[in-house]
Regions:
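C-terminal motif of bacterial Sec signal peptides marking the signal peptidase cleavage site
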Residues: 27-28
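Extracellular carbohydrate-recognition regions
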Residues: 38-73
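Extracellular beta-strand elements of beta-rich domains used
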Residues: 61, 236-240
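Short tryptophan-centered beta-strand motifs in secreted/extracellular beta-sheet-rich domains
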Residues: 61, 118, 173-184, 191-195
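Extracellular glycan-recognition surfaces and repeat-rich motifs
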Residues: 65-90
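Secretory/extracellular carbohydrate-interaction modules
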Residues: 86-157
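Short, aromatic/His-centered strand-loop micro-motif at the edge of beta-sheets
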Residues: 156-178
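Flexible glycan-contacting loops in extracellular carbohydrate-active proteins
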Residues: 202-234
Length: 245
């Protein structure tokens, strides 16, 4: 065998090295290369939306005395007090007198995205229906108002309407809300709102997802109750979150 190899090399001195290089080349092409740690191609807006939110304020009233007015809420008007049904404590606005009753809560959050979530329970009486509202950035900034009588939700900023959507209140059922103001590039602010029945999975789709050509100054969060039906309005699970820009 050795004689054959020696004879072959004498006759074709370059054939064996070329054969060896060909084997190495084929082996390199057929061997699976280790995966590269490449950066994600995730959409920048999706990546920003998934960034972690920080809790600024949270209250579920479970540790408060029934009949008390929570000290961490600034009541603008109305006889708001903690009430209880079975093992569930919540903040209640009485059904009488009828009027416009609001409150402020949480820290003044500025130069950040702001998210407010809460639960509410409102009940009609005959043909009379209640209304409620929530605000981001104080009483004069972004607000949505649910008018059960007209089956509409109106989104506004400083009393100027931004948009409206059809929405039918399910009387007697707890509802969850998520309301967000997301400052963008320049003076734009993205406003998002969704509502769903408490106990059900949060929907992915937003009822409102609008870009307002105004800068978001930030501030406190607010709630309002309008007991036009003469029945109590209940609020629970208040939570404010913020996210750095």
């Amino acid at each position: 065998m050795n004689e054959l190899i020696e004879t072959s090399m004498k006759r074709h001195p370059y054939r064996l090295p070329l054969f060896a290089l060909s084997c190495l080349f084929l082996h390199g092409c057929c061997t699976k290369a280790p995966p590269l740690d490449l950066p994600s191609e995730q959409n920048p807006e999706e990546q920003k939306a998934e960034e972690k939110w920080s809790v600024e304020f949270e209250e579920n009233f479970s540790s408060l005395e029934v009949g008390s007015e929570p000290e961490n809420l600034f009541i603008l008007d109305g006889a708001y007090a903690v009430s209880q049904e079975k093992n569930d404590k919540r903040l209640t606005l009485p059904g009488s007198p009828v009027g416009d009753f609001g409150l402020l809560f949480g820290p003044r959050v500025r130069e950040k995205s702001l998210s407010l979530s809460f639960s509410f329970l409102a009940t009609k009486k005959g043909r009379r229906l209640p209304a409620l509202a929530a605000g981001l950035g104080g009483v004069r900034s972004y607000r949505f108002r649910l008018n059960a009588a007209t089956k509409q939700i109106i989104l506004s900023r400083q009393d100027v309407e931004i948009g409206r959507e059809v929405y039918q209140l399910e009387s007697g059922d707890w509802c969850r809300v998520r309301f967000q103001a997301l400052p963008g590039d320049g003076e734009n602010t993205r406003i998002r709102l969704k509502l769903w029945k408490r106990g059900e999975e949060e929907p992915e789709k937003w009822l409102f997802d609008e870009v307002d050509p105004s800068a978001f100054a930030g501030g406190k969060c607010a709630l309002w109750g309008y007991p036009y039906a003469g029945t109590p309005i209940h609020f629970d699970d208040l939570k404010i979150e913020s996210k750095a820009l």
